[in-house]
Amino acid sequence: GVTFDDGAYTGIREINFEYNSETAIGGLRVTYDLNGMPFVAEDHKSFITGFKPVKISLEFPSEYIVEVSGYVGKVEGYTVIRSLTFKTNKQTYGPYGVTNGTPFSLPIENGLIVGFKGSIGYWLDYFSIYLSL
């Protein structure tokens, strides 16, 4: 896949991504907060089509992500992110995608998620997060 690195900002306002209920997570585009102003990061798109769009608009700054979870598994021989769930201090969004494979969970006990990086090919291969403490 193609690696991406959005860098770190001052918060997250909106998360847009795509999923397929039979395969995995596709593209990802995040609207961050940059010192009180929205900043739309680059659209990291899948190489293929056939996904359903998801738009998660957070009530920034009072709503923030406290956990990212999901499933990792094989699709056509590739290990990819098959499912994503975003839990905020107010509600849970998801799960989106295929909830089977190896589960993962990134609970955030201290700090805020302020950025994403990862790799996307046909599907979201992997991602990691930037934290602000």
From Swiss-Prot:
Keywords on record: Lectin
Outcome when changing residue 52 to T: In minor forms
Name of one Pfam family that matches: Jacalin
Result of altering residue 31 to V: In minor forms
Protein origin, superkingdom: Eukaryota
Nucleotide-binding among keywords: no
SMART domains cross-referenced by the UniProt entry: Jacalin (SM00915)
Alphabetized CDD domains for the sequence: Jacalin
Jacalin-type lectin domain: residues covered: 1-133
GO molecular function: carbohydrate binding
Assigned protein family: Belongs to the jacalin lectin family.
UniProt-listed PANTHER family: JACALIN-RELATED LECTIN 19, JACALIN-RELATED LECTIN 3
Quaternary structure and interacting proteins, as annotated: Formed of four alpha chains and four beta chains.
Protein name: Agglutinin alpha chain
